[in-house]
Amino acid sequence: MLDSANYTPRLKAVYRDTIRAALKEEFGYKNDMQIPRLDKIVLNIGCGAEAVRDSKKAKSAQADLTLIAGQKAMTTTAKKSIAGFRVREEMPLGAKVTLRGDRMYEFLDRLITIAMPRIRDFRGISGKSFDGRGNYAMGLKEHLVFPEIDFDKIDENWGMDIVIATTAQTDAEAKSLLKAFNMPFNS
């Protein structure tokens, strides 16, 4: 990312210049504040049993997620002890990061244009993963699709969850917003 004061991420400019007007026309909004926009993107890597056996796995996941997001990831810990899984309270189990503003648009741009085309046998993402309130959740089987991760230096292949929160009131509005960003839905 550039540190220039007048720098605007590509997708943010596209949203401002074309997507807002298209959505306003499509759904007939009377007020500009009704137009859906991206609120935040949450990335999560859960290490599960790997972190229970080796506490360094959660640190590795945190480092990888920090590289992918461009922002320091926080470690997620167990809320309570579960003896059957050998999990103790406050034991590190993964990492998560919340992206907002310019970093959010930069990440979405890299996800759509670079990471998704690198997924093996990729035929688009499901259009059914909306929560009913305009938010979209998806999962990746491996984090190696991001160019920030050096294939030779990783010790574990992590899957990750990506949640895209929008201000849309319905799933149709959110899907239309994400399609305008060229999100490759298969349905």
Swiss-Prot record:
SUPFAM superfamilies, per database record: RL5-like
The GO annotation for biological process reads: translation
Matches recorded under InterPro entries: Ribosomal_uL5, Ribosomal_uL5_bac-type, Ribosomal_uL5_C, Ribosomal_uL5_CS, Ribosomal_uL5_dom_sf, Ribosomal_uL5_N
Name the UniProt key words of this record, in alphabetical order: Ribonucleoprotein, Ribosomal protein, RNA-binding, rRNA-binding, tRNA-binding
GO cellular component terms given for this protein: ribonucleoprotein complex; ribosome
Gene Ontology MF terms in the entry: rRNA binding; structural constituent of ribosome; tRNA binding
Q: What does this protein do?
A: This is one of the proteins that bind and probably mediate the attachment of the 5S RNA into the large ribosomal subunit, where it forms part of the central protuberance. In the 70S ribosome it contacts protein S13 of the 30S subunit (bridge B1b), connecting the 2 subunits; this bridge is implicated in subunit movement. Contacts the P site tRNA; the 5S rRNA and some of its associated proteins might help stabilize positioning of ribosome-bound tRNAs.
**Quaternary assembly:** Part of the 50S ribosomal subunit; part of the 5S rRNA/L5/L18/L25 subcomplex. Contacts the 5S rRNA and the P site tRNA. Forms a bridge to the 30S subunit in the 70S ribosome.
Stored PANTHER family: 60S RIBOSOMAL PROTEIN L11-RELATED (PTHR11994)
Q: Which family does it belong to?
A: Belongs to the universal ribosomal protein uL5 family.
Q: What is the protein name stated in its UniProt record?
A: Large ribosomal subunit protein uL5
Q: Which organism is it from?
A: Roseobacter denitrificans (strain ATCC 33942 / OCh 114) (Erythrobacter sp. (strain OCh 114))
Gene that encodes it: rplE
